[in-house]
Amino acid sequence: MNSTPIEEARSLLNPSNAPTRYAERSVGPFSLAAIWFAMAIQVAIFIAAGQMTSSFQVWQVIVAIAAGCTIAVILLFFTQSAAIRWGINFTVAARMPFGIRGSLIPITLKALLSLFWFGFQTWLGALALDEITRLLTGFTNLPLWIVIFGAIQVVTTFYGITFIRWMNVFASPVLLAMGVYMVYLMLDGADVSLGEVMSMGGENPGMPFSTAIMIFVGGWIAVVVSIHDIVKECKVDPNASREGQTKADARYATAQWLGMVPASIIFGFIGAASMVLVGEWNPVIAITEVVGGVSIPMAILFQVFVLLATWSTNPAANLLSPAYTLCSTFPRVFTFKTGVIVSAVVGLLMMPWQFAGVLNTFLNLLASALGPLAGIMISDYFLVRRRRISLHDLYRTKGIYTYWRGVNWVALAVYAVALAVSFLTPDLMFVTGLIAALLLHIPAMRWVAKTFPLFSEAESRNEDYLRPIGPVAPADESATANTKEQNQR
């Protein structure tokens, strides 16, 4: 039996991947800044900064952190624009350049990298839990705490970005106060000044400073690429002009910078200072070394700090997106909650903590893998389509994003070429790959446009998906006829 227009239009639409309607959005600039502040206080920055002190002095590490985070925010301005305006998640947005089925390749890569981080951060939180129980009772069982902490984060993610937002609003000031106090304890315990610590480190120079910056960009690139899953909840003016939309994008990017950079600098400094003063990059061990001599209760309190920092980061940054990917890609198999559970299990089975000792090398490779993906998505939305999309076609198996049986092989080829080109500049792999993909995608899509149109008359129906006016109506005759003609080409 042939499907009706409304059934066909909704064949890829389900409650988990539908655009977030204007009236349902609850995140403003302040809330987004709080989310990013809490996400930025993550143990991975602690470790990366600590491992970097062999090549750079502490002040240089701080500059690299600030520069890397600023670059990440600049990219966020572009990658999140479509999600803020149209309320779509990353899996749906990837259909525009890569096709309805072709998007499976980049989103699977992105999901696996996010799950790597989920497992890694869960291990760090479990280490803190294990240390707390060891200090209190002498009991230690790291595998048990990995499972328990993973389950806690699964339940947290069930409640979505709204719950995570409120948790981060609470956690942010607590984490800030504890971080500042830990800095004081380290300096006081070592009897050194802030200026003296800033000049420590750098005994074995060799790493280019540009690589240091790219490492901190790499720490955020997985979130930068899939930021849609967070900012699709951001409030916007439905009637804003193109200029008004740009101002909204800038306002949210500014909020992200204010949340990300100060927190990253504080926690990065703690990691770098711990390494030069204690000689330990593992935050759980470093805290016991620094604070344990002062007070066991204080050491426990700061292990709670590590636990809270990880808990406030991991669900939003690393578990939300893979869950959306599963339920958007296989809507008949996974609900959002089952997607969260499966994603968490896969992340833990990857056992990413085995790579803790070479984290900076991994971050650089991560940036190189996702740089071309970010370049293609920015180029496609801003330069190729000029911020025009068809929500109706994003949820159809037979629309303008179908390309060759659902796959845009040209965009995938651009990704492969840009990735290969990035290896020509080992110290700037991320930048080279991003720029190469951004530039190559433009002529590539002009060639694609000779066969498949880039725009659809169904764009006029975008607001039907965003305003509370009831079910989406069938496409009008002209749009349907136009789409059929496109698919026959």
UniProtKB/Swiss-Prot annotation:
* Source taxon at top rank: Bacteria
Q: Result of mutating W117F? A: Reduces moderately the uptake efficiency
GO MF assignments: metal ion binding; nucleobase transmembrane transporter activity
**Binding-site residues for substrate, renumbered to this chain:** Q121, G219, N318
Subcellular location field:
Membrane
Q: In terms of pH, how does activity behave?
A: Optimum pH is 6.6.
Task: Return any one Pfam family short name.
Answer: Transp_cyt_pur
Q: What is its main location?
A: membrane
Regions crossing the membrane: 30-50, 58-78, 104-124, 144-164, 167-187, 207-227, 258-278, 299-321, 339-359, 362-382, 405-424, 428-445
For whether the record's keyword set contains Heme, the answer is no
Keywords (A to Z) from UniProt: Membrane, Metal-binding, Sodium, Transmembrane, Transmembrane helix, Transport
Documented effect of changing Q42F: Strong decrease in uptake and binding efficiency
Record-linked PANTHER family: NCS1 FAMILY PURINE/PYRIMIDINE TRANSPORTER, PURINE-URACIL PERMEASE NCS1
Belongs to which family?
Belongs to the purine-cytosine permease (2.A.39) family.
Q: What is this protein called?
A: Hydantoin permease
Species per Swiss-Prot/TrEMBL record: Microbacterium maritypicum (Microbacterium liquefaciens)
